[in-house]
Amino acid sequence: MLAYAVKRLISLAISLLVASAVIFAVVEIAPGDPARFMLGINAQPDTVAALRAELGLDVPKWQRYLDWLGGMAVGDFGTSYTYRTPVAQMVADRLWVSLPLALYALALSTAIAFPAALIAAARRGRGPDVAVMGATQLGVAVPNFWFAMLLVLLFAINLGWFSAGGFPGWDDPLAAIKALTLPAIALALPQAAILARVMRSALIDVLGEDFIRTARAKGLTMPQALWRHGVRNALIPVLTILGLQFAFLLAGAII
C-alpha cells in the first residue's frame, strides 16, 4: 500500500511538472509584454525596462521558469499583473469565503445526489428512475449563471428571503451562511446532477453482483440491499467525482 501511494505521488509530481512547463511555454509564446501592459502604451522605454527588471522579465526564460518553480515551492506565487498585489495574498483573502462556499455547495450536491441515485437505481426503468434522469439531464444542461439569476430574481428580489449580493463577514455565522446559500445552491445543483448520474450507474453495476443476489435471497428488499451492501461498493467512482467537483467548485469560487 505504501509503495502504491509513493508511486502515485511521484506520478502526480511528474504530471504537475509537465503541466507547469507546458503552461509556462504557452504564456511565453502568447504575444504581449506584461510590463508595457501594466504601464500603458505611452510609457517611456526606460520605465518599461525598469519594470521588466523589477519583475524579473529581463532574465532568460529557463531561469524565470526555475525561479517560478522555486517560488511555488515556498508559497510565493508572484505578483498579479492586473491587481499589482501578491497572488498568494489574493488567494488567501478569497479562501475565507471561497472554501466555505465550496464545502457548502459540495454538501448540498451530495445530499441531493445520493437519495436521487438510490431511488433511480432501485426503481430502474420505472417512473422514479425516468423522473430522476430527466431532472439530472436538465441540471446538466442549465447554465450556472442563468440558474443563479433565476434564484436571485425569485428569492432575493420577489420574495426578499435572501440578499441579492454582498457578504457580511463571519462575525455573524448565521448571516454569513444565509448569504452563501443562493450561490451554493446555484453551484450545487449542476454538480448534483452529474454526481447522481455517476452514482446511479455505479449502483446498477453493483446490482448484478453475487452479494446483492444473496442479500435479496435472505429477504432484503432492493432498496435495503442497495443501502446496506451496494452503496459502499459503488463509492469508488463517486469519490473520484467528488474530489474533482470539490477542486472545480473551489477554483470557480476563488476566480
Task: Give the predicted meaning of each segment.
Residues 3, 40, 50-53, 67, ...:
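Short amphipathic alpha-helical coupling elements at transmembrane boundaries
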Residues 22-29, 59, 70, 134-165, ...:
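Membrane-water interface segments at the C-terminal ends of transmembrane alpha-helices
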Residues 16-66, 159-179:
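Hydrophobic alpha-helical transmembrane segments of membrane transport/permease proteins
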Residues 58-114:
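An internal, D/E-rich "acidic patch" concept
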Residues 6-12:
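N-terminal signal-anchor/signal peptide hydrophobic helix marking the start
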Residues 2-4, 16, 92-130, 144, ...:
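Alpha-helical transmembrane segments of integral membrane proteins
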Residues 26-30, 38, 42-43, 72-73, ...:
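Hydrophobic aliphatic residues
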